[in-house]
Amino acid sequence: MLKEVVGLLTERQLLILETIIQDYTDLGQPIGSKTLQEQLPIRVSSATIRNEMAVLEKQGFITKEHSSSGRIPSLKGYRYYVDNLVKPVKIDSKSVRSIQSLFGNEYRRVDEIIEMSAKILSDLTNYTAITLRPEASDLKLEGFRMVPLGNGQVMVILVASDGSVESQIYNLPNNIDGESLEAVIRLINDKLVGSSLSEVTSKLQELQPLLTKYIEKSDGFIDVFGGILDKAIKEQFYIGGRRNLLNFANGNNLEQIKSLYSLIDDESAKIGGLVDNTTNPHDHHGISVKIGDEMSDRLLLDYSLVSATYNVGGHGRGMIAILGPTNMPYSKMIGLVEVFQKELTKKLIDYYRNFDE
């Protein structure tokens, strides 16, 4: 009897799962027992392979697509593979020098480096790339005010921990009085100030029932507050290759394609908001991988996000990420993101060294 490995699967089952994932990455087609028999590094009968595939399917690691006799990895299968089987590919020195040369320009502002890094990372992978500038990862909501302007209007003002200020005019409902307005200000300051900008986005929706006690139709206020928050977050990140997302959409699903178009063209912070500074339980040596429903947007069930934090000392931390299909070559992409993170960190340290002198 083959021994159990990683608590769930036998060595042979692990080998079959790994081969299915690697073949599906390369071919994009369901994998059958005959193909597996040719690909496996061990000699095993087709009947045995079918039996092992049935076990993997029953446990939810692979699934049947339509009427095909082949199998494809499930989200659970990808998760298990990334957590237990993936081995990052070592990037060759020629590719490293290529990345270094792409960063070779002189930059006058840190934002120019971060914006260029999103383009470079997108070009290297043909995926959508998201980069967060170093000062932004730890940004928190530091202050909230509503300043009366007269004629039933107030200026809603948000202050971030880096000193940046965003504001927007809000038309007050007719029946709101000064006391209710003060109660709203206290509520926001008590519940949201001190939270990271990415956390504020989700917490705001949770506050709506409380806000309704003071503002009868609170949707308008939440829209204004959310719009200001989007502007504050949007200024902290850059996106390269937005339209690459569409390359991996189901061509027969017009609704999905239309929704993805809306997502990538949205000037709010929705895509950039996927990258936050929260700890991921699935970190792989400093590289985080979120797969399918582990992301907040249901549109991205067929996508994976590979991200890494970079640290430039007293100048803060930032993040880089690629958003691509669930059948991406994880070994290669994790290795590439790891190298890119190191090279970006070097470039930023050089920039800040010159800047500080």
Regions found by a protein language model. Name each.
Residues 1-8:
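N-terminal intrinsically disordered/low-complexity leader segments
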Residues 79, 86, 93-357:
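Intrinsically disordered, acidic Ser/Thr/Pro-rich low-complexity regulatory segments
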Residues 21, 25:
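Short, locally clustered residues in the helix-turn-helix/winged-helix DNA-binding domain
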Residues 9, 28-29, 249:
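Residue-level marker of regulatory loop/turn positions in helix-turn-helix DNA-binding domains and
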Residues 9, 13-17:
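Short, leucine-enriched amphipathic alpha-helices that occur as contiguous helical runs
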Residues 26, 31-85:
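N-terminal helix-turn-helix
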